[in-house]
């Protein structure tokens, strides 16, 4: 066994090219596969960026190096110092001839999961051994695209003058008056894990921040057991002052469009590896009102009445009709939280919107109520006690500007971008009703 000592990686696998013929490199990673054929051994080393072939001919390396190569096992951690040799017959037009191989750590055998993807495994097995599962190139591709998604979103917000904030995740009461909260013991009191940063975002509008965003965990104690829901999720939230719901939708369009464009430019290998049918959307998305969506659903045989939230069957019907990215706007006020602003011409309809991808809701937003009296009235009308929202409501007494915002589900958006049909594929260590480990 060797320590890393004075060695440091000089290149990732994808950085080595045939034009480096004769150059010495140091590579580090996992043994993806090993073949020993008499006086010749082939070692495929895998790192974060891909794989690279090292050829170990007995007549060209010292005896110790050849013996080390023959005894390597799958997923051993190794470092190779060697020379690049151009070879048109090699998989990438070159190979690496080791000068020295250091075994940094051995992997036990047999492996509980095959990172080479030759042996398929069910998702529960893969999640149980997630540290091995994420060694698979296709799984890494999902999370590289997710990482680029988040980088792009932060850049767009920064370019548009937004301030990044962090809001509490330990709260005293429900954000939206719901019961789907995880209670925890907080010294002598009961507290809850935050289900949304909504109230804090609005309080910051009273503070004069104008434009804020947050990317953070939210927690919802909903007993869903579907491919679209998790109990711990990452939400991308924003709030803007002196705007209406149309401005908020335009900002959401910009964020989503830039994600597609940036991923196309910066992650072409991952797009190819996942065999994605990649298409950057138009800069503005189609829009359909809630009433029009209901009409579409009914025309396709779905039983639903105006004023009901869209059922799964209705979402599928509308998604089949609309396809791709589109907004559903002008929702019934009764279906939305108390802080949603009713339409001035018809209070039964509010200035809310959902961004959909086919049948999947990925974002929800609205123009908010900014008048104190109306907010108190809405809270009471929904059967809640305004006193429970005292610190929130106080922000509306002393100069709250008109404002709007939205929340975008990072995990669901990653599902869309990577064409996965299970949200758990897009979360490193998902938390659902059954899963609390690893």
From Swiss-Prot:
Question: What is the stated purpose of this protein?
Answer: Aspartyl-tRNA synthetase with relaxed tRNA specificity since it is able to aspartylate not only its cognate tRNA(Asp) but also tRNA(Asn). Reaction proceeds in two steps: L-aspartate is first activated by ATP to form Asp-AMP and then transferred to the acceptor end of tRNA(Asp/Asn).
Primary gene name: aspS
| Superkingdom of this protein's organism | Archaea
Q: What is its main location?
A: cytoplasm
* This protein's record includes keyword Disulfide bond: no
Places the protein is found = Cytoplasm
* Catalyses which reaction(s): tRNA(Asx) + L-aspartate + ATP = L-aspartyl-tRNA(Asx) + AMP + diphosphate
Where along the chain is L-aspartate bound? 176, 220, 364, 368
Family per UniProt? Answer: Belongs to the class-II aminoacyl-tRNA synthetase family. Type 2 subfamily.
GO BP field: aspartyl-tRNA aminoacylation
Swiss-Prot/TrEMBL cofactor(s): Mg(2+)
| Positions of the UniProt region annotated as Aspartate | 198-201
> What organism is this sequence from?
Methanococcus maripaludis (strain C6 / ATCC BAA-1332)
| The name this protein goes by in its record | Aspartate--tRNA(Asp/Asn) ligase
What cellular component terms from Gene Ontology apply here? aminoacyl-tRNA synthetase multienzyme complex; cytosol
Q: What is its EC number?
A: 6.1.1.23
PANTHER family named among the record's database cross-references:
ASPARTATE--TRNA LIGASE, CYTOPLASMIC, ASPARTYL-TRNA SYNTHETASE
GO MF annotations, alphabetized: aspartate-tRNA ligase activity; aspartate-tRNA(Asn) ligase activity; ATP binding; magnesium ion binding; RNA binding
| SUBUNIT field | Homodimer.
Keywords, sorted A to Z: Aminoacyl-tRNA synthetase, ATP-binding, Cytoplasm, Ligase, Magnesium, Metal-binding, Nucleotide-binding, Protein biosynthesis
Q: Which residues bind Mg(2+) 3?
A: 361
Q: Where is this site: Important for tRNA non-discrimination?
A: 91
